[in-house]
């Protein structure tokens, strides 16, 4: 089976069209071999069974892509320095100095790049290929090739690198667990890690442990890396752009229209570097408030190590982005008081790089807004510095000052605690809905943090949801196209909430029915949050409507499971009776729930086991409206017995207490619902009858 999730015809076609690259990985010397040609050669070698050749070509493809970017950055920096753009002069010839400098810079770039890269057209990869590299698909091929070559450490790192950008890929996760079983506890390396993001995460970890000196070291290094990456991102935006609204032969732009078209795309790209740098691999949405958070952590960390000058400097840097933040305003005032008599607080300014970035960002925003009005295109400014909810709901964010008379004034850190296995566990809270029936608690299910409920949804809702599922599900959806991700004896089909709403909005399924999926998942979330008596908000991490169907002719003498025994936020090691809470596990998941839609199938029981993955502690037969929920850690290993006849459907829900890991599609679905509600209100106010399905 192909390592990726789509047809590889385009890549293989590219291999056929590039005979010079096939069967080899480029000649020594000469211009840099295009990464798309090397990739095509690697894929061709893989499917031809030449795994050594595949690994060699894929490694060179990845290296070529990195070298291409590095060479373009080097040349663009060099030509920026050598050829300064001239100001416009007065009179009819006033534009000539500017355009003359522009032409000289273009010539500089060509003469700089051509010796190493060759003609620019050699490196214009197809969108599909660029997307593969963005999604790290070459690493999926690489890990398979390494397995065949018995290079298990390299295979594990390639699999881990792919998984970091594809966290829902269950097959790769299983592969990594197999590597751990085979080679013991291995140290996995993300070969495409963003250094500034790694340093930020390390800084936050040390901060959480109150190791403030180490936190400062990593967070300061993260800032250095961030600003360096921002400069690189700005420069890379100066490359070719696509004119999607004018991709037809008749388009003939005038001089200024063509310049404006291109520059607006460059400017929008540069403006969005802030989002790019704040986005983790494989995610669409950035970490909210990412850059300001560095200064927020640092202002308190510096206070705790006694460096009040740096604390005030970082507090004022943070206030550039959020000048009305009362907590940090109080902190800054407190730091000023600590410095009285030693340093004049007025001499301590926000950091220059933060001021410069914010000034540039505001100017970019202004130009984009002006251009949108003048050139007639739509532009909506994202909230790049958005803070999610109240400060106390954010993860590990420094807060305000409190006075404690017995010790004198000092800072009080208010932060949402990171969920730990030894936190106080509660259950038995209200179920919130009168029709929901309690069945079993943790003790009755022979475990910890478990509950079984019935009547969460009605028979009619089950039928309606099943009808929606039939209209929107695709084989392999949610499993990167793998139709049988856990067992070859069953077919898996799935869909997300956002997909359901999209289909409903397009009229492909009744919108009322599509919204039911959204509403019942929210109902389940509220029940779980209430029953387990959580003192902070429970967020969606992933929501998936999934049906698994027994394949006819493949059910005799089955001894496999529909879904192998696993834990949801750690890597289960049955032999060691351990569950390793580390990547690539979904370590941010805290609670899970399965809401069942039907019972007309054979097999498919949900089971809890001991950590040995063998001793069954509870078995649950699905039926319409039944929901099992549990904490996601190693205390609750679970799986699904083989479905031997019929189709088993359920809504699978995973939740997190960390808002940084909220489900991206859920946020988008919330926006769709808000938009639909607003449209509905608008129609009501105009006394217009909405469509039936609304």
UniProtKB/Swiss-Prot annotation:
The active site is at 648. Pfam families: 2OG-FeII_Oxy_3, TPR_leprecan. It is an enzyme of class 1 (oxidoreductase). TPR repeats lie at residues 35-68, 136-169, 196-229, 292-325. Residues 543-657 form the Fe2OG dioxygenase domain. InterPro entries: Leprecan_dom (IPR056585), Oxoglu/Fe-dep_dioxygenase_dom (IPR005123), P3H (IPR039575), Pro_4_hyd_alph (IPR006620), Pro_4_hyd_alph_FE2OG_OXY (IPR044862), TPR-like_helical_dom_sf (IPR011990). Keywords: Coiled coil, Dioxygenase, Endoplasmic reticulum, Glycoprotein, Golgi apparatus, Iron, Metal-binding, Oxidoreductase, Repeat, Sarcoplasmic reticulum, Signal, TPR repeat, Vitamin C. Fe cation binds at residues 566, 568, 638. GO terms for cellular component: basement membrane; endoplasmic reticulum; Golgi apparatus; sarcoplasmic reticulum. It catalyses: L-prolyl-[collagen] + 2-oxoglutarate + O2 = trans-3-hydroxy-L-prolyl-[collagen] + succinate + CO2. Residues 395-427 are annotated as: Disordered. Residues 1-23 form the signal peptide. Its cofactor is Fe cation; L-ascorbate. Residues 386-418 form a coiled coil. GO terms for biological process: collagen metabolic process; negative regulation of cell population proliferation; peptidyl-proline hydroxylation. This is Prolyl 3-hydroxylase 2. The gene is P3H2.
């Amino acid at each position: 089976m192909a390592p990726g999730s789509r047809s590889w015809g385009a890549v293989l076609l590219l291999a056929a069209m590039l005979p010079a690259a096939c069967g080899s990985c480029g000649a020594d010397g000469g211009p840099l071999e295009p990464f798309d040609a090397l990739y095509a050669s690697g894929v061709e070698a893989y499917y031809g069974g030449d795994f050594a050749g595949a690994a060699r070509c894929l490694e060179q493809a990845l290296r070529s892509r990195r070298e291409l970017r590095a060479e373009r950055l080097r040349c663009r920096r060099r030509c920026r320095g050598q050829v300064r753009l001239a100001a416009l002069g007065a009179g009819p010839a006033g534009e000539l100095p500017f355009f003359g400098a522009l032409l000289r810079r273009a010539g500089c770039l060509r003469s700089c790049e051509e010796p190493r890269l060759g003609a620019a057209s050699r490196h214009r990869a197809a969108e599909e290929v660029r997307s593969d590299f963005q999604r790290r698909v070459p690493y999926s091929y690489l890990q398979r090739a390494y397995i065949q070559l018995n290079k298990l450490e390299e295979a594990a790192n390639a699999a881990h690198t792919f998984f970091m950008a594809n966290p829902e890929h269950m097959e790769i996760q299983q592969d990594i667990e197999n590597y751990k079983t085979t080679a013991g506890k291995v140290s996995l390396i993300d070969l495409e890690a963003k250094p500034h993001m790694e340093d930020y995460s390390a800084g936050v970890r040390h901060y959480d442990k109150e190791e403030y000196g180490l936190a400062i070291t990593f967070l300061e290094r993260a800032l250095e890396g961030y600003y360096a990456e921002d400069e690189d991102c700005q420069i890379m935006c100066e490359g070719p752009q696509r004119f999607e609204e004018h991709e037809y032969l008749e388009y003939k732009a005038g001089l200024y229209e063509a310049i404006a078209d291109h520059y607006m795309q460059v400017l929008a790209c540069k403006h969005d570097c802030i989002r790019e740098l704040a986005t983790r691999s494989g995610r669409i949405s950035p970490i909210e408030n990412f850059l300001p958070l560095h200064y927020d952590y640092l202002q308190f960390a510096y206070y705790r190590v006694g460096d009040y000058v740096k604390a005030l400097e970082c507090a004022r840097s943070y206030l550039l982005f959020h000048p009305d933040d009362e907590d940090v305003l109080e902190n800054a005032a407190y730091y000023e008081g600590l410095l009285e008599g030693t340093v004049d607080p007025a001499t301590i300014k926000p950091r220059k790089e933060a001021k410069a970035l914010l000034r540039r960002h505001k100017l970019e925003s202004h130009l984009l807004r002006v251009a949108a009005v003048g050139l007639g295109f739509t532009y909506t400014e994202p909230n790049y510095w958005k803070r999610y909810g109240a400060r106390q709901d954010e993860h590990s964010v420094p807060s305000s000052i409190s006075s404690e008379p017995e010790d004198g004034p000092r800072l009080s850190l208010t932060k949402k605690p990171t969920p730990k296995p030894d936190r106080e566990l509660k259950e038995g809270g209200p179920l919130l809905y009168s029709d929901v029936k309690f069945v079993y608690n943790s003790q009755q299910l022979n475990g910890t943090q478990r509950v079984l409920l019935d009547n969460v949804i009605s028979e009619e809702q089950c039928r309606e949801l099943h009808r929606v599922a039939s209209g929107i599900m695709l084989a392999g959806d949610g499993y990167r196209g793998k139709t049988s991700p856990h067992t070859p004896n069953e077919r898996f089909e799935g869909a997300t909430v956002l997909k359901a709403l999209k289909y409903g909005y397009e009229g492909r399924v009744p919108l009322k029915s599509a919204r039911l999926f959204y509403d019942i998942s929210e109902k389940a979330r509220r029940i779980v949050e209430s029953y387990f008596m959580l003192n902070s908000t429970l967020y969606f991490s992933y929501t998936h409507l999934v049906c698994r169907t027994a394949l006819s002719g493949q059910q005799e003498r089955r001894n496999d499971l529909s879904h192998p025994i696993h834990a949801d936020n750690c890597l289960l090691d049955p032999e060691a009776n351990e569950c390793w809470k580390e990547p690539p596990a979904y370590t941010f998941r805290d609670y899970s729930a399965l809401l069942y839609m039907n019972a007309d199938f054979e097999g498919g029981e949900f089971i809890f086991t001991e950590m040995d993955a063998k001793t069954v502690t509870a078995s649950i037969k699905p039926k319409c409206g039944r929901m099992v929920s549990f904490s996601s850690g190693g205390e609750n290993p679970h799986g699904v017995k083989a479905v031997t006849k019929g189709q088993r459907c359920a809504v699978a829900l995973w939740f997190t207490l960390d808002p940084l890991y909220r489900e991206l599609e859920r946020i988008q679905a919330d926006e769709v619902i808000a938009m639909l509600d607003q449209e509905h209100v608008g129609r009501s106010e105009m006394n217009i009858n909405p469509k039936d399905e609304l």
